[in-house]
Each structure stands twice: as structure tokens, then as C-alpha cells.
Amino acid sequence: MGIYDEHLDRNAANYQPLTPLSHLARAALVHPDRVAIIHGALRRTYAEFYARSRRLGSALERRGIARGDTVAVMLSNTPAMLEAHHGVPMTGAVLLSINTRLDADIIAFQLDHSEARVVLVDREFSGVMAEALKKAKVTPLVVDYDDPDFPADAPVAKGPAIGSLEYEALVAEGDPDYAWHMPNDEWDAISLNYTSGTTGNPKGVVYHHRGAALMGYANVIASGMGRYPVYLWTLPMFHCNGWCFPWTLAVQAGTHVCLRWVRAKAMFDALADHGVTHLCGAPVVMATLINADAGDKRDFDQTVTFNTAAAPPPQSVLSGMRDAGFEVTHLYGLTETYGPAVVNEWKDEWNALDGPARAAKTARQGVRYPALEDLAVMHSETMEKTPADGETIGEVMFRGNIVMRGYLKNPEASAEAFRGGWFHSGDLGVLHEDGYIELKDRAKDIIISGGENISSIEVEDALYQHPDVATAAVVAKPDEKWGETPLAFVELKPGRSVTEADLIAHCRERLARFKCPKEIRFQEVPKTSTGKIQKYVLRKAIG
């Protein structure tokens, strides 16, 4: 032991576990009268937000919820969802945010697997939740959320109440001065998120308080959030806990603008009326903004930061967003990394680049997020790092405090994911000389044709360069001669038409002949609720 190891012990005065709940507590103390939440006509200050979250935690505790229990929520982007992100972990319990697009079988699996003791359900989803509860083995307390701002002309009808009490009644039971519980350890679980489950049942990904707290700071840095940002909820809060933004805004005393449905008019109204500074979403949200009807569009004065994930947006989309007043930042991550763990951090000197050189920079995923300790491209078996040559393909791997604790009740999957002391993403990419990574494909999406590897992303990029293409997805089609060949599924922009032969010829002008799709099918491309293309659905379609 050295001199710095003696008589310098950890104690309550010099160490407290990190938790994002402290972000809200501080904002309520320092900025009690600032508006924290906007939802239709409703306005809630930070003092009210904190008090209601404490009431929720208190009410749950009085009903027996304690450390290590699971509270499931199936809620839209509403104030109740924001309160659940704070009130549930205040008891020491773990928040499970259920994807609102799931079917009853998967919901029932998640309720049983997580051993959910309480379910908070928005009445928009009461029908599927009622069906799921009939299939599930657990018998949780069911609480209905009746959104007072649910529009009368909604595209879907509000379902019946299925619970034993209503959300506001539950909150009213609680104490606004509730002495909530700090985690015993910052490694304690704060939330549970399930993977998409494209093969078999989904895996339960466990987040801890430390990672969630650090993501609060990291999001502020990566998104360039100054004081009092205004954040529009176009990203579902159930998706990786909304990339941890429910916990982020309080760091800078920002305002949450809730949005139940992503509609062009509602987004432009929020941008113009509330001075929105930041939003997140898949490329489909950008397309909705760019292609909005003239009657839905409104002018706004501020420059808006738009964080997007999934595949890098085509240059035409980026140009359209810039012209409309948005600065697009490309992020990359997985459920297992709390959402974004890589950011394409733009450099001022790149603004002087010509079109092709600039496009090459925007096509990359980027560098490690501020809260991530290390990011590497490695050989998945030998664990040797690939050279930074922009050509040698390896598996993208993560290491740091915003990597999950592991998969719930699945030690084998956790051990495999963490093999060699790194989280294995399953994504294939290259490392460029300047340290930026670029994805080339998912391991399962590489097409091997005649012994040659074809990146489906490269083929999709070529298709996106055609002015009539709105969405493109390329998968492998079994072929007796070549083993596999590229098959493209394409959605055209409204009112556009192009032939299969024209698109194949377009690709041949941009790709090696063996990389070009041999067949193109024009149809709607299936996507998840967050806008990600579901290639496994397309694979099933071709057998």
C-alpha cells in the first residue's frame, strides 16, 4: 500500500452513488419555477415535476413496491412517462418501458420474464395489454393512464379502463415530500429494456444508475445543449429509455415537449410555438419534416439540432434538413449501450470539403460518446484490433460505463456478449486513420456471393442516390450458382415511378457488377416503431 491508500477511505461525506434522479432534484431546487413539461395546454414546473415523481414513488412504496421489483409501463410520450422514469427508481424498483407496437404474446413474455408487479398502461393500448395480461402468468396491479390531452379527433380510439385504479388517483395517494431512496450502489439496476427479438424471445437488457447518470451529462455534451434547451419528444421514450433524455433535460433545466404521435403539423407547431432546440428520431422523421404539406409547415427562427441514428441519411435528406433550419448529428449505438454510444462529431474544417468528400465524412458513424471509455474495431475471435486503414473489416466493440450490466436471467448470453472483456455489437465496420469508425454491415447482413463479401449498406447507399427512391433495404437471396446474390426491396417517393431495369442500371454505374442487385421488388419496407428497417421480415418473405 502507498501513502494514498492509508487513512483516505470512502465514506458518506466523500462518496455518493451516481443516479440521474439527482439531476431532477437539483433542477427542482435551483429552477423550481421553470417549465419542465409541456403537453398540449398543460404546463408543469420543475417543482411540480419533482413533487409528482415523489408522489408516484411514495404511492408505489405504500403498495409494497421495493428495491429490485419491476414496474412495467406501456405509455406514450406523455408526462406520466417522464414521471415514471423518476418515480419508479425512487423506490429502488426497476422501470420496464414496453414498446407500444408489440403484440400481446411478446408483452406477456416480458411481463412474466421481468416478474412485473405493477403495470401502468395508457388507454390507447389497453386492448393489447388486456389480451397480454390474460396470457401472462403474473398478476400485477394494473393502473390506467387516461391522458387528459388525448385528442378528440385521434386516429385511434381510446380503449376502456382495464385497471383497478387510475393513474391520477395513484399519484394522489403519495407524499410530495417522500424521502426517496438513493441506490445502495450506482451499479444497482434502474431500468430494463428488451431487444427486438428477431430470433426467438427478446433479451432483457439491464441498465444501472451510474450509466444513466453519465448519459445525462454525455447527451448534453454530444448534443451541444446550452442552458434551458427545449426538447421535442419525437423519439419514443420506450426506446432505450428515450436514449436517456428523460433524465438528461434536468441537467440544464430544459423543457420536455411531449408528443403522442409524430405528425408533421404537430412538429412544426412545436418548433414555432415552443422554440424547440433539440429532437431525435429515425430518418423517417426527417422525411416527414422535409416532405410535409405546405399547409403543415411553419417558419421558426432558431437552428434546431436533430440527432438521428440507424443508417446515415442520404445527402439529399441532409441538404433538405439544412435548408429547413436543422443541423443533423448522426449517432450510433444499441439497446445494450443505453442508446447512442458513438457520435459523428463534426469538425469545422470539414465544411470546406466538396460534395463527395463531405459525403464520405457524413457516412461514418463517428467516435466514442463522451461517457464511453473505449471503442474499437477488432477481429471477433482473436480480439486483435484492426489497422486504422478504412478498409479492414472487423467487429465493432464497446467498453465502458454505458454498457449494460448484462442480460436478465441469461448468463450464457451475457458471457458471450462480454467475451474478452469487450461488448460484442455484432456490427461490422472499419476504423479510419482519424479514429472514426464506419459501419459496413451487421454480421448477419453481409452477402457472400461467389466467395466475395458484399456490404448491403453499400448497395443501399447506391440505391438512395436515385432521386425517386425513398427507402431501400438489401438482403441476401439464396442462389444455386453464387451462393447468395443481393435482392433489393424499394419504396418509391410518392408520385414517382421507375423500373427495375432502370434501378439496376443506376447501381451498375456506381458499383462493381457483382455487387449490384439481381432483383428489385417494389413494396412497402417493414420498419420498427422507431423507424428501423426489419430485414428479418424481408428474409422470411424470400424463404
Task: Enumerate the predicted regions with their spans.
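Conserved AMP-binding/adenylation subdomain of ANL enzymes
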Residues: A213-V230, F238-H278, A292-D293
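Adenylate-forming
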Residues: S76, V121-E131, D147-P148, L235, ...
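Conserved structural elements of the adenylate-forming
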Residues: Y50-S58, A172-D177, S191, V205-R227, ...
